[in-house]
UniProtKB/Swiss-Prot annotation:
Name of protein: Nitronate monooxygenase npaC
GO biological process: response to toxic substance
Record organism: Metarhizium robertsii (strain ARSEF 23 / ATCC MYA-3075)
Keyword Oxidoreductase: yes
Cystine bridges: none
Gene3D superfamilies attached to this UniProt entry: Aldolase class I
Lineage of producing organism: Eukaryota, Fungi, Dikarya, Ascomycota, Pezizomycotina
Length: 357
């Protein structure tokens, strides 16, 4: 993809999100943890906030209702228009309910829908994309992928996405555990491979501040999506024990692992084979590595869950899903502060680099 086409893609994305400021900062749709308060706060600060998938598919209605209420009391100047909510909503397609999703999108018309994790590959994504576009033609469909092959297949499909989110191996969300590629290699390789497709690219995975954002922009991204950094926001819908761990942790390469263990301990089974999440290592993982049987691990996990915030931490047993860059997250801030600081730092870095060439 040429520099001229990359700029055209950025401009097209910005035009579809007229209230946003450049560079575009996005809060990723983390399951349950990114609720209405966080999504609206990010969009209100000139970014794009996404609601995460909900525990039950039908719970998305309550989240969208609340987001609409918040936006009604504090409208965002320059929003996409009266017919579109200036937030997005994410769906895991493998265990999502397409009928519920279509109903929710029809009612609230979010500006974007983020699709991820199909069980049946691109065919499943084609079904969801076509249904979403039929329900709300002005809603943009974002598709998260983690490999070059997925990106090329999506771009050449019968229903190519409006935006491709490229999740590098550093990400904390469920990503490809066997053929994942780091963000710094994935973004430019996809950009080159797609050539003149005209699909804007959003970088995700390992980005928690303006330094990562600046790097992603130079690689060809039109914006950046952050998950772990927004876990340390005052609006995040998570327990204090979880959030304390996000701020405390360091050395993500050493202290995190990709595994389905914590999903299973929490009673979540059935994720498609290519995917696994990244979590902080604690007693559950160390005991698993030592050969403790799953049934015993489950008992200890469930006992730990009854202790509240003490269930997290190096000696805890509960899941703390984070990205490899967790060591760069050092404090809790309001979401608006995170958006502004990331944007301003990225601008300053890029300006400085150009000035010194």
């Amino acid at each position: 993809m040429t520099a001229l086409l990359r700029n055209e893609c950025k401009q097209a994305l910005a035009k579809s999100l007229p209230w946003t400021k450049s560079p575009l900062v996005i809060s990723a749709p983390m399951r349950v943890m990114t609720g209405p308060g966080l999504a609206v706060a990010v969009s209100s600060a000139g970014g794009l906030g996404f609601l995460g998938p909900t525990l039950k598919p039908e719970d998305v209605f309550a989240d969208l209702d609340k987001a609409a209420e918040l936006l009604g009391s504090s409208p965002i100047q320059g929003a996409a228009g009266p017919s579109l909510l200036p937030i997005g909503v994410g769906f895991q397609t493998w265990n999502g309910d397409l009928e519920v999703a279509v109903s929710a999108v029809t009612k609230h018309r979010p500006c974007a829908v983020w699709l991820f994790a199909p069980r049946r590959g691109q065919a499943e994504l084609n079904e969801w994309t076509a249904a979403i576009r039929s329900a709300s033609p002005d809603t943009r469909v974002w598709l998260q992928v983690g490999s070059l092959g997925e990106a090329v297949e999506a771009a050449a499909s019968a229903t190519p996405p409006d935006v491709l989110v490229l999740q590098g191996a550093e990400g904390g969300g469920h990503g490809r555990h066997r053929d994942a590629q780091g963000t710094i290699a994935l973004v430019p390789e996809v950009s080159d491979a797609l050539g003149h497709s005209g699909i804007p690219l959003v970088a995700a995975g390992g980005i928690v501040d303006g330094r990562g954002a600046a790097a992603a922009l130079t690689l060809g991204a039109a914006g950046v999506a952050m998950g772990t950094r927004f876990l340390a926001s005052s609006e995040a819908r998570i327990s204090k024990g979880y959030q304390d761990e996000v701020v405390r942790a360091s050395d993500g390469a050493k202290n995190t692992v990709r595994t389905q263990l914590y999903n299973h301990l929490r009673g979540t089974f059935g994720w498609p084979e290519p995917f696994s999440p990244r979590t902080l290592i604690n007693r559950s993982w160390r005991d698993h590595e030592a050969g403790v049987e799953f049934d015993r691990l489950k008992e200890l996990h469930d006992e730990s869950a009854k202790t509240g915030d003490a269930g997290w931490g190096p000696e805890g047993r509960l899941a703390t899903y984070v990205g490899a860059a967790v060591g760069l997250v050092r404090r809790v801030d309001d979401a608006a502060v995170i958006v502004r600081e990331t944007r301003d730092q990225a601008r300053a870095i890029l300006t400085s680099v150009v000035a010194h060439l």
